[in-house]
Design a protein with these regions (language model features):
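Conserved N-terminal helical subregion
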Residues: 2-9, 24-26, 48-165, 169-184, ...
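Conserved Rossmann-like nucleotide-cofactor binding loop
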Residues: 17, 40, 157
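Glycine-rich FAD pyrophosphate-binding loop
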Residues: 26-43
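C-terminal auxiliary extensions adjacent to catalytic cores
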Residues: 353-373
């Protein structure tokens, strides 16, 4: 038997974006129906000052910081030789931290559960239908969810983006992959266990690592072209550097995830559907802004909800954030292109970073980290 449920607002997606949107709406007193399957959340993420400012607006900064590892620097090295290129020391007054994705999710769920106007439904949506009066979502079980407004927070390959832009407007197939692993800190050299971000630049590839879970684990992200991720890639990429030899252990489980090209949709809102998070902006991970910009989206919405009716707040959030996030997305994409330089170009890049020193790198990154959105 088909059930029909009517709600003022449905949030599609139960990941970081969906929960953040629900919290922004629920904190403003709006009844919210959060629909979707809780995603798997391995690994970690980094947060910069702009991300923490957004979390503060959502009253989430203290809870997440309690679970996070403070980072005091970014150290950049050559991946093949371990040669030190430069080091950026963070100002202690500015928060930089790393946290496990599961801890972030736990904090978001805990916050959402304190808001009585948020309800959860654990199901998979099959279809999103837009009309002039309401939006309808149909689950795989045939249940229908009708809403005055839908927040699409189900990612770049989600139904919400497809419904807003058209089924043929999905992100292009990625040419690059991120190999992600979470490893016990005790199994890695001391260099990995310091409270900092370690960026190692290679020939057509790069790796980022940082501590999470109170320093007990290290999150590693190795980015390279998809055609290089074949049998034996660990030995080829890590085997020549003694510092990285432990990473060739076949027991390490690497998650192969796509790196979609950077993209900000020009339109985030149509009819009764509004996109938020990476459904609206595909953010490369190279400046540690993926989750942070999602929190900025939600914080922007919360501020506007205190000033305007719901529909006007959604209009303004979509218009404002679709412009604001463009510069950061372009800079993240440019950083990725620099990091994945190969051959002689990669050697020239490393020489330039070494000669330019920390001031140049800090000015390049600080413009993003301190951005007032």
């Amino acid at each position: 038997m088909t059930n029909t449920v009517t709600s003022p607002i449905v949030v599609l997606g139960r990941g970081i974006a969906g929960l953040s949107a629900a919290i922004a709406l629920g904190s403003a007193g709006y009844p919210v129906h959060l629909i979707g399957r809780p995603p798997a959340t391995p690994g970690g993420l980094q947060l910069s000052p702009n991300g923490f400012r957004a979390l503060s607006s959502l009253s989430l900064d203290k809870a997440i910081l309690d679970k996070a590892d403070r980072l005091n620097a970014v150290v950049i090295k050559a991946l093949s030789t371990n040669r030190h290129l430069t080091e950026i020391i963070h100002d202690p007054k500015h928060l930089h931290a790393a946290v496990s994705r599961q801890d972030v999710m736990d904090c978001l769920v805990t916050k959402a559960e304190t808001l009585s106007c948020i309800r959860f439904t654990n199901t998979e949506i099959h279809t999103v239908q837009l009309s002039t009066e309401k939006a309808k979502l149909v689950s795989v079980d045939g249940d229908i969810f009708s809403a005055d407004e839908v927040i699409g927070a189900d990612g770049p390959k989600g139904l919400a983006r497809a419904a807003l832009t058209g089924q043929n407007s999905m992100p292009p197939q990625p040419a690059y992959r991120a190999m992600r692993a979470e490893i016990e800190a005790a199994k890695l050299p001391t260099a990995f266990r310091r409270p900092l971000t370690l960026l190692m630049l290679g020939d057509g590839c790069h790796m980022v690592s940082y501590p999470i879970k109170g320093g007990s684990h290290i999150n590693l992200v190795f980015c390279t072209s998809a055609d290089k991720v074949t049998i034996g890639w660990q030995q080829r990429c890590f085997g020549l550097n003694p510092l990285l030899s432990n990473l060739t252990d076949p027991a390490i489980s690497w998650a192969n995830t796509p790196l979609y090209p950077a993209e900000v949709l020009p339109v985030w809102r149509r009819a009764h559907l509004t996109l938020l998070g990476d459904a609206a902006h595909v953010m490369p991970p190279h400046l540690a802004q993926g989750a942070g910009q999602t929190f900025v989206d939600a914080a922007c919405l919360k501020v506007l909800l205190a000033e305007k009716p719901l529909a006007q707040a959604l209009d303004q959030m979509a218009a404002t954030r679709s412009i604001e996030v463009q510069a950061i997305t372009k800079k993240a994409a440019a950083s990725g292109q620099i990091m994945r330089l190969g051959g002689i170009a990669s050697q020239a890049r490393n020489i330039f970073i070494d000669m330019a020193g920390p001031h140049f790198m800090n000015s390049w990154l600080d413009e993003v980290w301190q951005a007032e959105n």
